[in-house]
Amino acid sequence: MDSGQPWFPKIHTKEVRRRLSSLNIATPSSSPCNMNWQSLEPKHIINDNVYGTVKVPRPIDKLIDTVEFQRLRHLKQTGLVYLVYPNCEHSRFVHSLGTFSLAYALVDKLRHSQPSLNITESDLICTSVAALLHDVGHGPFSHLFDGEFAKRNGSRFKHEDMSILIIKKIMNKPEIKSEFACILGETDEEYAKSVTLITELISGKPFDFQDMDGFKDLPADVREETVKNEWAIIGCGPEKSFLFDVVSNSYNGHDVDKMDYLLRDSKASGVGITFSESTLERLFNHVRVVIDPNSGLKRIAYSIKCIGDLKAIGDSRQELHSKVYQHKAVRFMETLMVDALINAGDFLKYKGSNGELYSLKNVTEDVDAFLKTTDYVEQEILNSQITDPKMIEAQTALLKIQRREIGCKLGYFEMNPENATQLKGNCNNQTGAAEVVKKVGQKMKEILEQMDDTEEMDGKLKDIQFTVMHSVLGRGLDDKTHPIERQIFYDGKPSEHEGKQVVGFYPSEDYVINNCPRMATKWEIFVMGDRSLRKEPLLADRVKRALQLAGESEKFLTPRKRSPQDSPDEVSSSCSTAKRRLEFGSS
């Protein structure tokens, strides 16, 4: 390896590659501040279509060569999206490699630019391992398995919980432990603490106490004492709190996991977003650790000049959810796939650690059994010789997907979650949106029956089969909070603060009012019908009209009254800022 070559992931465009060389991230083995470090020179160099190459040092390569990690090759990153966007066939394997490369580069940059942080070799490796293994707990078809399938199966399974179990299994293998012990801890106690930190970097939420009522109003000394008392992380102390902003940032969502999948999924689907490779490069050029003005903890911050670049992360997430992840055809095919998995779930068996067989429905009860499941479950169902009616029904559902016998979108409307006030507290989550779908579907049936009688349609409208569905399009946090509101910034350039302890700040209220929507989440309610309705435009139009009337009747959708010459887009655009200012002023 050329010792003069910087060790960091290179973005695949030539211009950005050239500019990235200015980051001055030195090769780990040549760092003057860590002369006693074990050499972490790349063991493998893997081609990557987003970053050009991903360089994997020893002993990280040993984790990649485990059966648990290799399983990710057989899990598509975006589930069934490839059925609409054919190039989205990339796997959790490549996403995990990309997330690792960003995490390593970010922590290594902070280590060189801010030696006072005392980032150790163990800190770097723990963060890198957490990034590499953060998705090993995903089931078949990724989020479909721990989403709608788990819900209909009556399970509370979350892939993060399974990831923790699998990580512990991997890291405690004798051959893995012997490779990592010299870095993570020679004694069993030290090693176990490091493994705990790895899992906490994925699932830990060390900053939740900041949301306690009145926390920000406490005197500084009381807040400092509260932080010490509320720090619930076992793997490290509050002095390394900034590490929890890297892989899985539960506070604002601006982490390398999201950065990688936004770039990778956008590139694969061909759907453009505002977050780009040059945005990533700019952020890495302006990152540093500062003091959180609210908690006094050390947090990752960016120059205030990058506020638009950070805002693009949440906005791009919503864009991809709208156009890619929750595409209407994808959502309909997901319903068919879940039908198939539920019906075939009792017949598909996987051997667990004790030799016992677990069905697909309870496979999450045993780690070894779970690790035998992949996206290949679809072929297991299609190739099954079982003649039980449920298995035949499952095969029929999958054949509908293959033959493209799926519904077509007849109409939709967007709604503000706040309009679902009558749902008694369920309006700000998936449950609330599902309740809206239920109410709208019932109302549509009534309206279509009335239309059928009024227009003398001879029962055609009454007999129409349709499905009302929903999409929750968020920016990564709750319905009202834009992630940028919870991001810490600093003034100037990183070089201006070398050797100094900087107190950061949050975006001003004026910026939030003028640049962020009042609601960070929107719901899309849409109706899918048989494709034959495309040949019956009159019937399709009536279904679309019924959806609109049902939304207005249930007060989920506000009826619009305007003169013919009014442009609804212009009216909405001109009034939105003033309306938001009034609402903030009255609060």
Curated annotation (Swiss-Prot):
Named cofactor requirement(s): Zn(2+)
Catalytic reaction equation(s): a 2'-deoxyribonucleoside 5'-triphosphate + H2O = a 2'-deoxyribonucleoside + triphosphate + H(+)
Gene Ontology annotations of biological process type: deoxyribonucleotide catabolic process; dGTP catabolic process
Enzyme's top EC category: hydrolase
Compartment(s) of residence: Nucleus; Chromosome
MF (Gene Ontology): deoxynucleoside triphosphate hydrolase activity; dGTPase activity; GTP binding; metal ion binding; protein homodimerization activity
SMART domains documented for this protein: HDc (SM00471)
Keyword line: Allosteric enzyme, Chromosome, GTP-binding, Hydrolase, Metal-binding, Nucleotide-binding, Nucleus, Phosphoprotein, Zinc
Modified residues (Phosphothreonine): T558
Regulation: Allosterically activated and regulated by GTP or dGTP. Allosteric activation promotes the formation of highly active homotetramers. Phosphorylation impairs homotetramerization, thereby inhibiting dNTPase activity.
Residue segments, region Disordered: 554-587
GO cellular component, one term: chromosome
Keyword Transport carried by entry: no
Cofactor note: Binds 1 zinc ion per subunit.
Main subcellular localisation: nucleus
EC number of this enzyme: 3.1.5.-
Domain named HD: residues: 92-262
Pfam families assigned to the protein according to its UniProt record, in alphabetical order: HD (PF01966)
Function as written in the Swiss-Prot or TrEMBL entry: Has deoxynucleoside triphosphate (dNTPase) activity. dNTPase activity acts as a regulator of DNA precursor pools by regulating dNTP pools. Phosphorylation acts as a switch to control dNTPase-dependent and -independent functions.
PANTHER family assigned: DEOXYNUCLEOSIDE TRIPHOSPHATE TRIPHOSPHOHYDROLASE, DEOXYNUCLEOSIDE TRIPHOSPHATE TRIPHOSPHOHYDROLASE SAMHD1
Note: Does not hydrolyze dGMP and dGDP. Shows significantly reduced capability to hydrolyze the chain terminator triphosphates ddGTP, ddITP, ddTTP or 3'-azido-3'-deoxythymidine (AZT), in the presence of dGTP activator. Able to hydrolyze an anti-cancer agent, araCTP.
Entry's family note: Belongs to the SAMHD1 family.
Self-association and partners: Homodimer. Homotetramer; in dGTP-bound form.
The name this protein goes by in its record: Deoxynucleoside triphosphate triphosphohydrolase sahd-1
Organism of provenance: Caenorhabditis elegans
